[in-house]
């Protein structure tokens, strides 16, 4: 096999590849063995049709596409290795010559990884983040904990207030007609939660149990149901019950209920302070790491191929789809609820995709420039750390990873970011 690489404009080039006739014939033979298994011919068992009879009836050319499917991936893979290039998208293949007993000649138009011209990446000035925890921070965290342990109790007297939960019946009408999905009974609505259409919850404030009211609202212009978007609506609402939050008293008993590891309220406050300090420190470290990476990426010169951005967008959509599935939703439902589609979603994600690609390319360039390596011992230590974190045997982690190559690359990236932080101003 012979391969010739010709660089064109930008990050595109053409590989001209020639494969020996012997390999071509071998691929045609392999194609015949595959195809003949599917053919029934009177007088022969299935898959036992003689080759000469096959070629007489169907022609050797009928095997060419299957033969190409066999030979092209191998030839293309060997050619890019020989040329020392790094494709970032599927090639555009053009077959110039393919026939029995002759060399295969084809071209592959390839988009390759762009050259990265690193700018300043050492001595980057980053803002130091305040990590001090105040008494007010601790009190706010304690109050949040108190809120989470609050109980809803029926308000026997009084009216609906912000923060209450109103148990209601409701039915919505647009142009005097009830609409699908606009009716509910004994629905518990937290006032101030923003669960319903803007303006709905506020109009329930001041109502007593047993009272009814016509609530006038307008659906948002971007509402997921296109037939309702932007339209005024009337909801007939009846309040059946009002519940209010009853906060537990802040004392030692509360502390023990909130955290079995403490015995007093003072101990709980001390633990909350420690947790807040660790959280702020962790947050500050992440902020510095993000900032140095973004600065290094901004200082670099890169002509990013659109194909790389498209690939990253596809990856981001898959990640988003996985997150939706964890919430019991899928992309189609998401599109219905948000009034968007696949193209709009990708457009929303495009800026982040460009940023991701740029950062990845810059970190790869820094790894190369600084000769950052990862030892086998470091990979093993990371696998053991993962095993401890997930409560799994080391062998199970290795089996789940399949190959540790990707893990080693992740560790190199982590080291590159460590290098940027250590060398920041």
From Swiss-Prot:
* GO biological process, alphabetically ordered: 'de novo' cotranslational protein folding; cell division; chaperone-mediated protein folding; protein transport; protein unfolding
Q: Where in the cell is it found?
A: Cytoplasm
Role this protein plays: Involved in protein export. Acts as a chaperone by maintaining the newly synthesized protein in an open conformation. Functions as a peptidyl-prolyl cis-trans isomerase.
Give all residue intervals belonging to the PPIase FKBP-type domain: 163-248
Keyword Isomerase assigned:
yes
- Spell out the SUPFAM superfamilies in the cross-references: FKBP-like, Triger factor/SurA peptide-binding domain-like, Trigger factor ribosome-binding domain
Name it.
Trigger factor
According to the UniProt record, one GO cellular component term is: cytoplasm
User: Domain of life of the organism in this record?
Assistant: Bacteria
Q: Which reaction equations make up its catalytic activity? A: [protein]-peptidylproline (omega=180) = [protein]-peptidylproline (omega=0)
Q: Which residues pair up as cystines?
A: none
What family is this? Belongs to the FKBP-type PPIase family. Tig subfamily.
InterPro entries assigned to the protein according to its UniProt record, in alphabetical order: PPIase_dom_sf, PPIase_FKBP_dom, Trig_fac, Trigger_fac_C, Trigger_fac_C_sf, Trigger_fac_ribosome-bd_bac, Trigger_fac_ribosome-bd_sf, Trigger_fact/SurA_dom_sf
User: How does the entry describe the domains?
Assistant: Consists of 3 domains; the N-terminus binds the ribosome, the middle domain has PPIase activity, while the C-terminus has intrinsic chaperone activity on its own.
Q: Which UniProt keywords apply?
A: Cell cycle, Cell division, Chaperone, Cytoplasm, Isomerase, Rotamase
GO molecular function annotations of the record = peptidyl-prolyl cis-trans isomerase activity; protein folding chaperone; ribosome binding
Q: What is its main location?
A: cytoplasm
Q: What is its EC number?
A: 5.2.1.8
- Please give the organism: Bacillus cereus (strain AH187)
